[in-house]
Amino acid sequence: MEQDGDQLSARPALETEGLRFLHVTVGSLLATYGWYIVFCCILLYVVFQKLSTRLRALRQRHLDGAAAALEPDVVVKRQEALAAARLKMQEELNAQVEKHKEKLRQLEEEKRRQKIERWDSVQEGRSYRGDARKRQEEDSPGPSTSSVIPKRKSDKKPLRGGGYNPLSGEGGGACSWRPGRRGPSSGGUG
């Protein structure tokens, strides 16, 4: 019986010794490599999350492909819908191209007509710019809010005389200024 009591008392001592050893080993390991272990765990978690979502998507595509292979009607309907959408988009694009071509053709026709009118007016001896103004006035009869009324220039007096130039010495002013000579001054060295 004594032997059994010694074994029982010896066993807890061994267990406590093992726990101390484990505590010291794990504590020193965490003290030296603790942050590395934490960062590695976080990195593994993130990588696992990314791979699991990709794996799920890959499985889903595989299952969809298998289901589509089993149901050819679904594939045919999908292809028909795709072809119809492409055809509709092409028709819209063709309509836009036709509208653009029509606009360009109208602009070219207008330019050609204006050139012919200018040529005719030049051949007759008229100014084509004056004719263009008259045509504009004829095209928009009545008062226009956006048009600017030209001011009369004859009512205003000119601010200066016609030939006044302060740098040349001509015109109004009692003194006349002339620029100096560019050469060396006379009477100097040289």
Swiss-Prot record:
Annotated segments matching region VCP/p97-interacting motif (VIM): 78-90
Cellular-component GO terms for this entry: cytoplasmic microtubule; Derlin-1 retrotranslocation complex; Derlin-1-VIMP complex; low-density lipoprotein particle; very-low-density lipoprotein particle
Coarse class of the protein's main subcellular location: cytoplasm
Keyword Lipoprotein: no
Chain intervals with Basic and acidic residues compositional bias: 115-138
Cysteines paired by S-S bonds: none
GO biological process: cell redox homeostasis; cellular response to lipopolysaccharide; cellular response to oxidative stress; endoplasmic reticulum unfolded protein response; ER overload response; negative regulation of acute inflammatory response to antigenic stimulus; negative regulation of endoplasmic reticulum stress-induced intrinsic apoptotic signaling pathway; negative regulation of macrophage apoptotic process
Any Pfam family hit: Selenoprotein_S
Tissue expression notes: Ubiquitously expressed. Highest expression in liver and lung, with lower levels detected in spleen, kidney, brain, lymph nodes, small intestine, stomach and heart. Very low expression detected in longissimus dorsi.
Membrane topology field: Single-pass membrane protein
PTM statement from Swiss-Prot or TrEMBL: Truncated SELENOS proteins produced by failed UGA/Sec decoding are ubiquitinated by the CRL2(KLHDC2) and CRL2(KLHDC3) complexes, which recognizes the glycine (Gly) at the C-terminus of truncated SELENOS proteins. Truncated SELENOS proteins produced by failed UGA/Sec decoding are also ubiquitinated by the CRL5(KLHDC1) complex.
Cross-referenced InterPro entries: Selenoprotein_S
Signal peptide: none
Region ranges (Disordered): 115-190
Compartment(s): Cytoplasm; Endoplasmic reticulum membrane
Domain of life: Eukaryota
Listed transmembrane segments: 28-48
Phosphoserine PTM sites in chain numbering: 140
An MF annotation (GO) of this entry: ubiquitin-specific protease binding
Keywords: Cytoplasm, Endoplasmic reticulum, Membrane, Phosphoprotein, Selenocysteine, Transmembrane, Transmembrane helix, Ubl conjugation
Gly residues composition bias: residue spans: 160-174
Record bears the keyword Endoplasmic reticulum: yes
Quaternary structure and partners: Interacts with DERL1 and (via VIM motif) with VCP, suggesting that it forms a membrane complex with DERL1 that serves as a receptor for VCP. Also interacts with DERL2, DERL3 and SELENOK. The SELENOK-SELENOS complex interacts with VCP.
Protein function: Involved in the degradation process of misfolded endoplasmic reticulum (ER) luminal proteins. Participates in the transfer of misfolded proteins from the ER to the cytosol, where they are destroyed by the proteasome in a ubiquitin-dependent manner. Probably acts by serving as a linker between DERL1, which mediates the retrotranslocation of misfolded proteins into the cytosol, and the ATPase complex VCP, which mediates the translocation and ubiquitination.
Entry's family note: Belongs to the selenoprotein S family.
Protein name per the record: Selenoprotein S
Species: Sus scrofa (Pig)
